């Protein structure tokens, strides 16, 4: 009887593991880190520039959750240059093979670098000055949006979001610093 009980226990554990693995395949965890060494005239420095975690979940074939949490410059707090940011957290519904709808916190579809801003998409260690100080790279807002492909090479990206902080009294209304976080 002991051998039969042992085999039954092993079989039930194997079944439980198979069920657990099936459920876990719907959730993915990923990320990347970026460590910089800069040797400049004013001194050299090492900076863990960013550490990014992705957590995604597929509820159904056409319904997904995407999120991105980022820690910049290793340290955050009063008097420190670091930041902890929730850059993305949105649900996307693929209502057809070529079109989808999303809502939540997402990257605004503007420019070349905003939605594809990972370190391997620009040349060098740092982003160039225009993309770093003028164009809002990594600009996210809360809202909803549609995107898709009408024909090969003809796509669209339309978003309704919380917008820019362009106060008329703001002397620097054209600067990147006026982008507010949702």
What kind of feature is each model-predicted range?
Residues 46-76:
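Surface-exposed extracellular loop regions of Gram-negative outer-membrane beta-barrel proteins
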Residues 1-37:
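N-terminal periplasmic/intermembrane-space "pro-region" immediately following the signal or transit peptide
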Residues 23, 59-61, 95-97, 150-152:
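Outer-membrane beta-barrel strand-turn architecture
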Residues 22-28, 36-50, 173-177:
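Surface-exposed strand-loop-strand hairpins of Gram-negative outer-membrane beta-barrel proteins
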Residues 35-41, 50-52, 71-75, 107-109, ...:
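Transmembrane beta-strands of outer-membrane beta-barrel pores
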Residues 31, 53-57, 89-93, 103, ...:
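Residues on the lipid-exposed face of transmembrane beta-strands in outer-membrane beta-barrel proteins
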Residues 27-33, 65-67, 101-103, 156-158:
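Transmembrane beta-strands of outer-membrane beta-barrel proteins
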Residues 76-80, 97-182:
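Surface-exposed coil loops of outer-membrane beta-barrel proteins
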């Amino acid at each position: 009887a002991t051998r039969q009980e042992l085999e039954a226990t092993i079989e039930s554990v194997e079944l439980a593991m198979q069920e657990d693995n099936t459920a876990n395949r719907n959730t993915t965890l990923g990320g990347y880190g970026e460590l910089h060494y800069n040797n400049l005239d004013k001194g050299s420095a090492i900076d863990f520039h960013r550490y990014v975690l992705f957590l995604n979940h597929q509820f159904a074939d056409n319904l997904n959750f995407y999120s991105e949490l980022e820690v910049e410059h290793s340290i955050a707090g009063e008097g420190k240059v670091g930041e902890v940011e929730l850059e993305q957290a949105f649900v996307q519904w693929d209502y057809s093979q070529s079109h989808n709808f999303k809502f939540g916190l997402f990257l605004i579809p503007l420019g070349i670098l905003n939605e594809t801003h990972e370190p391997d998409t620009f040349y060098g260690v740092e982003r160039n000055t225009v993309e770093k100080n003028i164009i809002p790279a990594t600009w996210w807002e809360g809202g909803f949006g549609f995107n898709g492909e009408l024909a090969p090479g003809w796509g669209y990206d339309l978003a309704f979001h919380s917008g820019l902080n362009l106060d008329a009294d703001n002397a620097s209304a054209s600067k990147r610093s006026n982008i507010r976080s949702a």
